[in-house]
Amino acid sequence: MARAGPRLVLSEEAVRAKSGLGPHRDLAELQSLSIPGTYQEKITHLGHSLMSLTGLKSLDLSRNSLVSLEGIQYLTALESLNLYYNCISSLAEVFRLHALTELVDVDFRLNPVVKVEPDYRLFVVHLLPKLQQLDDRPVRASERKASRLHFASEDSLDSKESVPASLKEGRPHHPRAKCTEALAKQSLVMDADDEAVLNLIAECEWDLGRPPGSTSFSQKGREADSRGSQESRHLLSPQLVQYQCGDSGKQGRETRRSSCRGCCLEKMPWSQLCGELPPLYGAEPEASRAPRPHTYFTPHPDSMDTEDSASSQKLDLSGEMVPGPLPAPGKCRKRRMPVGRFQTFSDQEGLGCPERTHGSSVPKESLSRQDSSESRNGRTLSQPEASETEEQRSRGVTDTREPSPGSHSALPGKKTALQAALLETLLDLVDRSWGGCRSLHSNEAFLAQARHILSSVEEFTAAQDSSAMVGEDVGSLALESKSLQSRLAEQQQQHAREMSEVTAELHHTHKELDDLRQHLDKSLEENSRLKSLLLSMKKEVKSADTAATLNLQIAGLQTSVKRLCGEIVELKQHLEHYDKIQELTQMLQESHSSLVSTNEHLLQELSQVRAQHRAEVEQMHWSYQELKKTMALFPHSSASHGGCQAC
């Protein structure tokens, strides 16, 4: 590769010298420029020398030592660029050609970037859409398609990985999506604690109501439940995540709730809550009396939410009390345990002893969660079981909630009075409507009144939720308004600073303009003075040179007279020569006439000689014919005479 020697920046004077343009011609007229490197001088930087070459279409900078292409972006009309045997080593310098959209032919051969960058050719093809030839090789359609696919995939990956901070700040964050993202980032693979829970269930033979061996059941149950509560965040299904995240107005509350999900589940033996289930409606099928696994609930599952949701507390009444669609995910949120893990009570044990359930320490929300979880898991109860479940649900709902000391102080008196009145109304309704013989599912009067109570509760909770959401929105808007005001103040300060700078610069520009005007006036005055001086000097020169011009005219006339005299002499000589030629012509004419007469005489003599010769020839022909006739008369005599001589 060409070595980069001492720094040599191309200058506009060198461009003019190489192109042959005069100092007063515009560089924009130049269309072709060739500045190849030599052994003495090799250009390393372009500088701002090409700024005025806006009409240049062909540029040859081969065999130089260019390490940077800064300054080439001014050649917007360039079509051919030759950078053969330079020192361009990175794609960042090649990227400076992106402004030259008219490039058709580019040559980067013997540059380090060709050998160092594996995607160099695809990069250049993608960078220049009109490129037809690269490094003395034509650009094929397959290469253009490959470059488009290659760099389009990289752009999509970069856009996914690097989102601008302004977009991240300006984009609204939905709390449910935020909660889902936070849970999705956590591992879903079982760790040692999950394996311990599964081993405990296996040792109990899938019945947590039976202690595994000689180990204390209560101690192991607490350990397993504690581990399960700590690890349940990793086992949440997407549907459960959506239910737990809640609506967009409760983002802060749900964030604090997720931090409290590590609380331990309290194991409560069912024998303390109720006794044996008395048989109803005679003997039940074996399948309905089969024991089911127990469920354990926390004493106060929602106590952690009361400090930030006191204005939006609502009684969690299960949607299964009345026929109809399930409540919205935002309203089902409080019927789930904070840790998101459910276990199932035995149907017979869970439906027994409603009187003891009424006075137990199990909160109404836990029983409500149990019923909602059983309905979501698809369990179908028989008519007696449904009746008892309805009774248990009703009595569980009427239980007075015992919040923690921290949350008890946060509950407003109006909400407590409303809850007490609602519970009292439900108790009276259950006492009036249910006699223990029939299911409340078929009691239309009870269902109508229960629906009325539930609708009033839902309206109240909806109003509370909307007020809380509006309050939170107002707070967020106030914070946003403060931030916008502070930003506006900063922008105003910055604008004021910029305006002061611009004003100062404008004042300085006006001052410079005044100076330039004064200088222009002085220059115009000096120009007019010089013009008047030039006119006066011309007049003086004309008056002083009059005599000299006359003398010059006389000398010129004299020389012309002499020249004419010489011409006259020459003409006289030519005339004498003409006379001599005329005499010679007459002599030649006379000799010609004599020659003609001699020629005629000779022609006459020749004709006479020809006639005589013709007569002689005819005489010879006649003599020859006579001789032949004579010889023809004596052939035999001559032959016999010849034979005798032979004998």
UniProtKB/Swiss-Prot annotation:
**One CC-aspect GO term:** centriolar satellite
Q: Does the keyword Coiled coil apply?
A: yes
Q: Which InterPro entries match?
A: CEP72-like, Leu-rich_rpt, Leu-rich_rpt_typical-subtyp, LRR_dom_sf, U2A'_phosphoprotein32A_C
Instruction: Name residues in a coiled coil.
Output: 476-620
Q: Which GO terms describe its molecular function?
A: identical protein binding
Q: Where is the composition biased (Basic and acidic residues)?
A: 152-161, 220-234, 366-377, 390-402
Q: Which residues carry this modification: Phosphoserine?
A: S237, S382, S404
Show the segment(s) annotated as Disordered: 152-176, 211-256, 285-413
Gene3D superfamilies assigned to the protein according to its UniProt record, in alphabetical order: 1.10.287.1490, Ribonuclease Inhibitor (3.80.10.10)
Its main subcellular localisation, reduced to a broad class, is cytoplasm
**Record localization:** Cytoplasm, Cytoskeleton, Microtubule organizing center, Centrosome; Cytoplasm, Cytoskeleton, Microtubule organizing center, Centrosome, Centriolar satellite
| Annotated LRRCT domain residues | 111-150
One GO term of the biological process aspect: spindle organization
**Origin: domain of life:** Eukaryota
Keywords for this protein: Coiled coil, Cytoplasm, Cytoskeleton, Leucine-rich repeat, Phosphoprotein, Repeat
LRR repeat positions: 29-50, 55-76, 77-98
Q: Provide the assembly information.
A: Interacts with KIZ, PCM1 and CDK5RAP2.
Q: Which PANTHER family match?
A: CENTROSOMAL PROTEIN OF 72 KDA (PTHR23311:SF7), HEAT SHOCK REGULATED 2 (PTHR23311)
* Family stated for the protein in its record: Belongs to the CEP72 family.
Q: What does this protein do?
A: Involved in the recruitment of key centrosomal proteins to the centrosome. Provides centrosomal microtubule-nucleation activity on the gamma-tubulin ring complexes (gamma-TuRCs) and has critical roles in forming a focused bipolar spindle, which is needed for proper tension generation between sister chromatids. Required for localization of KIZ, AKAP9 and gamma-tubulin ring complexes (gamma-TuRCs). Involved in centriole duplication. Required for CDK5RAP22, CEP152, WDR62 and CEP63 centrosomal localization and promotes the centrosomal localization of CDK2.
- What is this protein identified as? Centrosomal protein of 72 kDa
To which species is this protein native? Homo sapiens
